[in-house]
C-alpha cells in the first residue's frame, strides 16, 4: 500500500469549472505529517511509516508517548497513524521528516477513510432501510417494527447477522475513487470532489486510490 496523509475534515463547499458547472467538494486541512518511526522487515516483520500530526497538550501525553516522540525528535501530535510501505515509498523518508500536501497532485484519484457520524441506537427502518408496515388496517403498534426474526418452528431461531435495530454510524468507512480538485501546499489544504466520511473536524486518512 502507498503512503498517505492524515488530515482534518474542514467541511464542504463548491467550486466552479470554466464552463460554469458547480462541483461539490470537501476541504481537508493537511498539517505537516511528522514521521515518528520507520519500520522495516528485519526488526518489525513488515515495512511501514508511522506519522503524527497536529498538537496535543503536554498534560495529555503519557510518559511512553513522550519518550516515543522525543526519540523521533518531533512534537507530540494528537495521535499516531501507520502506512504500509514498499522500498520506493521509503526512499528519502527519515525519522523526524515531514510529509506535506504536495504528496498528491491535481487530478489524482484518492481513497478517503474516516469515522462516520454516529446516529445512536436506531430502528430497522432508518438503519437498514426496511419498509414500514401498514399505517391502518388493523395495525396499531407495529408501524415501524421489523416483524418476524425467527421464521417458523423450523429453524425456530434467529440467524447470526440478522439485520435488527442497533447502534448506527460511528464506524470506520472508506470512500474510494475521489478526485483531487486542487492542492494548496502553502496553506496545507486538499480540495477533494464529493463527500467524505465523518463530521467536520474529524480526522481522515487520504491515500492514493487502489483502483486508480
From Swiss-Prot:
Q: Which organism is it from?
A: Psychrobacter cryohalolentis (strain ATCC BAA-1226 / DSM 17306 / VKM B-2378 / K5)
Q: Which NCBIfam families match?
A: L3_bact
Record keyword Metal-binding present: no
Q: Which GO terms describe its cellular component?
A: cytosolic large ribosomal subunit
Q: Compositional bias (Polar residues) at which positions?
A: 140-155
- Any matching Pfam family: Ribosomal_L3
The entry's function note states:
One of the primary rRNA binding proteins, it binds directly near the 3'-end of the 23S rRNA, where it nucleates assembly of the 50S subunit.
What PANTHER family does UniProt report for this protein, alphabetically? 50S RIBOSOMAL PROTEIN L3, LARGE RIBOSOMAL SUBUNIT PROTEIN UL3C
- Please report the PTM annotation for this entry: Methylated by PrmB.
Q: What is this protein called?
A: Large ribosomal subunit protein uL3
| GO function term, MF aspect, one | structural constituent of ribosome
Origin, by domain of life?
A: Bacteria
Whether Ribonucleoprotein counts among this entry's keywords is yes
Query: Family assignment?
Result: Belongs to the universal ribosomal protein uL3 family.
Q: Which GO terms describe its biological process?
A: translation
Q: Which residues carry this modification: N5-methylglutamine?
A: 153
Q: Where is this region: Disordered?
A: 140-166
Keyword annotations: Methylation, Ribonucleoprotein, Ribosomal protein, RNA-binding, rRNA-binding
Listed under subunit, the entry gives: Part of the 50S ribosomal subunit. Forms a cluster with proteins L14 and L19.
Q: Which residues form a coiled coil?
A: none
Amino acid at each position: 500500500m502507498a503512503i498517505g496523509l492524515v488530515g482534518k475534515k474542514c467541511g464542504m463547499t463548491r467550486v466552479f469549472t470554466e464552463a460554469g458547472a458547480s462541483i461539490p467538494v470537501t476541504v481537508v486541512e493537511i498539517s505537516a505529517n511528522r514521521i515518528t518511526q520507520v519500520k522495516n522487515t528485519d526488526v518489525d516483520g513488515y515495512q511501514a511509516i508511522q506519522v503524527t500530526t497536529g498538537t496535543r497538550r503536554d498534560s495529555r501525553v503519557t510518559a511512553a508517548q513522550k519518550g516515543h516522540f522525543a526519540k523521533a525528535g518531533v512534537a507530540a501530535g494528537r495521535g499516531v497513524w501507520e502506512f504500509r510501505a514498499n522500498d520506493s515509498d521509503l526512499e528519502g523518508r527519515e525519522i523526524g521528516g515531514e510529509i506535506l500536501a504536495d504528496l498528491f497532485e491535481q487530478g489524482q484519484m484518492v481513497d478517503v477513510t474516516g469515522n462516520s457520524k454516529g446516529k445512536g441506537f436506531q430502528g430497522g427502518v432508518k438503519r437498514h432501510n426496511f419498509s414500514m408496515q401498514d399505517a391502518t388496517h388493523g395495525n396499531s403498534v407495529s408501524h415501524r417494527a421489523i416483524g418476524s426474526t425467527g421464521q417458523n418452528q423450523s429453524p425456530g431461531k434467529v440467524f447470526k447477522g440478522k439485520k435488527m435495530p442497533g447502534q448506527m454510524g460511528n464506524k470506520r468507512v472508506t470512500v474510494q475513487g475521489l478526485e483531487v480538485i486542487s492542492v494548496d501546499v502553502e496553506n496545507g489544504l486538499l480540495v477533494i470532489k464529493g463527500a467524505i466520511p465523518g463530521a467536520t473536524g474529524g480526522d481522515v486518512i487520504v491515500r492514493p486510490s487502489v483502483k486508480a
